Amino acid sequence: MVAAMVAALRGPSRRFRPRTRALTRGTRGAASAAGGQQSFDLLVIGGGSGGLACAKEAAQLGKKVAVADYVEPSPRGTKWGLGGTCVNVGCIPKKLMHQAALLGGMIRDAHHYGWEVAQPVQHNWKTMAEAVQNHVKSLNWGHRVQLQDRKVKYFNIKASFVDEHTVRGVDKGGKATLLSAEHIVIATGGRPRYPTQVKGALEYGITSDDIFWLKESPGKTLVVGASYVALECAGFLTGIGLDTTVMMRSIPLRGFDQQMSSLVTEHMESHGTQFLKGCVPSHIKKLPTNQLQVTWEDHASGKEDTGTFDTVLWAIGKDAASHTDTVSSSRKPYFLGRRVFAFLPITSWILHSAGS
């Protein structure tokens, strides 16, 4: 993807030459006169790993580049800064919390090597969360500085297309900005999926968008799903001493080697993670104690069962953020896929997509 963009920006290849130039110029000129829009060689929508890499590469080629990034708060109100999923709600905080779990295991084993450590070892979620969140915020700032150093213009705006060369962005205060560019990259990533068929899922559940930004310990946690995100979260929650259960509909780590998947789940079980296999949740309700009562169906027995938890974490997959309002259009709905945008002609080579 980045290589294709570099080729497009380096020279007037036929493949990347717009085919509706005269019409586009007129549209852009009218919009500019009306709204005083800013123009760029490249506009990147999305400030995650792919978008930032693309923007920096183009800037190194001497192009005038802008990045438009906006984080739609999760249903629980969680939001974050520049850097995308990996920096804010993915790789970085996950690895830090995993490290906290590993340290706990080392401390528990230390007495075998002569260290006299009071047992049981207690973990303070607030202390860990504050350290993780402060580190993430430092990375947010670092990305801002890197863009500034490369003379990449950063806009904290929610983008929607006016036409294939023009984007309208609205900031959190409602102020609109018009941006135009020779090439536009869509790199808006994905957001966790909620099981909307499960009553109470949206009202009472959280996702990986929220777990790393909780101020208080999640307590006894039910993780629904068997993806790597589900097992990673369940693993570090168990590792820091929380009562953790994984509910999975079928097999763990679908798409991965199943012999290795079995070794992973067996290892987790040996360390205290519980698994509910062949189970699907049907509804959640909040009890007077503020705990969550989860009802599920056991496919093996055909019976219903219930359990009480402090937190329910959905980890059942992601949807492309472009399917939501993160990037919207005044024209008919579009999708990302083999045809990048359904509302644009296939012969248009000025729109590109990157990432998930």
Residue ranges and their predicted role:
Residues C91, I186-D243, M247, H271-Q274, ...:
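Glycine-rich dinucleotide-binding loop and its adjacent helix/turn
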Residues V246-R249, S262, E266-S356:
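Internal nucleotide-binding/catalytic subdomain
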Residues S39-V67, A230-G239:
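N-terminal Rossmann-like FAD-binding beta1-loop-alpha1 element of flavoenzymes
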Residues G46-G48, G189, S227, G317:
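A short acidic Gly-Thr/Ser loop motif
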Residues G51, S74, R191-R193, A230, ...:
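Glycine-rich nucleotide phosphate-binding loop and flanking beta-alpha elements
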Residues M1-G36:
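N-terminal mitochondrial targeting presequence
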Residues I45-G46, D69, T78, V224-G225:
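The Walker A (P-loop) glycine that initiates the GxxxxGKT/S ATP-binding motif of P-loop NTPases
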Residues L9-P12, R21-L23, Q38-F40, E57-K63, ...:
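Glycine-rich flavin
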